[in-house]
Amino acid sequence: MSWDDEDFAVPSGSKEKPVLNSWDDEFAENDDEPVLESWEDEETAKPKPKAAAAAAAKAPKKASPSPAATPAATKNTMLDIDTLDDKTRKELLRKAELESDLNNAADLFGGLGVAEEHPRARAEREREQLAAVAQPAALTKDTPIQSHPLFSDLETKKDYQELRKALATAITSTSNKSLLNYSGGLAIDLIRDISKPMTVENIRQTIATLNVLMKDKEREERQARLAKVKGGTATGGAGKKKAKATRANLGGAFKKDNDFDLGGNDNFDDFGEDDFM
């Protein structure tokens, strides 16, 4: 008896399931399961989908606005806007539209690397910055006077003349408040302080100019003092007028050419030699 004489029956299930060619084919059918490096490694337990669903169910849900509350809020907002004037209402609507456009642009181009600031928003911001810069800053005692354009733009002789006129008008107007403080606390010390950077020749010219001013002031004060006295003159004196030499009015009886008759003897030689005494 030999092995060739034996008959082997082929199982009927071989037609439905193909025969594996190698051990690799067996593992290839189960691609979803990872291959363990050793038989001792335990397979990790897969998370149960039921646990994730239960956690999601326990999470608090955001309350969605009720349909009845939304029209009421919109109605109140519209009523507040309607109470404003046209200019303010248009400005609010324009800002709301701009904000809506920015939000839509951010949602649309958020992941494409587009600049975050919208061109319209950038233009609006630049306009507000220019308006803020154009407004003059409030002046205080701590504000440096050198920041004034009259000082910062000093270049030509005309600029210095304009500065001199502005300072003279502003400083001399303070004399009306207190002439004593103006003279003793401002003018004299100011002339001394501003003369320090000057040369000796310039100081001499300043003294000569002040001497001319002093003589003019003396003449004006003397004329004002004499004007108060009736008949006063600018040359001084007590203010009295000199009497003019005039003839007394004796009437028509006394004339130069009239002959006067005294009623006596005109012969003054009637005395004798013995009538001497």
UniProtKB/Swiss-Prot annotation:
Q: Which key words tag this protein in UniProt? A: Coiled coil, Cytoplasm, Initiation factor, Protein biosynthesis
Q: Name one GO molecular function term.
A: acyl-CoA dehydrogenase activity
From the Swiss-Prot or TrEMBL record, give the protein name.
Answer: Eukaryotic translation initiation factor 3 subunit J
Locations of Acidic residues compositional bias? 23-43, 267-277
What's the family?
Belongs to the eIF-3 subunit J family.
Q: Where is this protein chiefly located?
A: cytoplasm
Q: Name one GO cellular component term.
A: eukaryotic 48S preinitiation complex
Residue numbers spanned by region Disordered: 1-80, 257-277
The superkingdom listed in its UniProt entry is Eukaryota
Where, per UniProt, does this protein localize?
A: Cytoplasm
Q: Does the keyword Amino-acid biosynthesis apply?
A: no
Bias (Low complexity)? 50-75
List the Pfam families.
eIF3_subunit (PF08597)
Subunit annotation:
Component of the eukaryotic translation initiation factor 3 (eIF-3) complex.
Q: What does this protein do?
A: Component of the eukaryotic translation initiation factor 3 (eIF-3) complex, which is involved in protein synthesis of a specialized repertoire of mRNAs and, together with other initiation factors, stimulates binding of mRNA and methionyl-tRNAi to the 40S ribosome. The eIF-3 complex specifically targets and initiates translation of a subset of mRNAs involved in cell proliferation.
UniProt feature coiled coil, ranges: 199-230
A GO BP annotation: formation of cytoplasmic translation initiation complex
Q: Does the keyword Iron-sulfur apply?
A: no
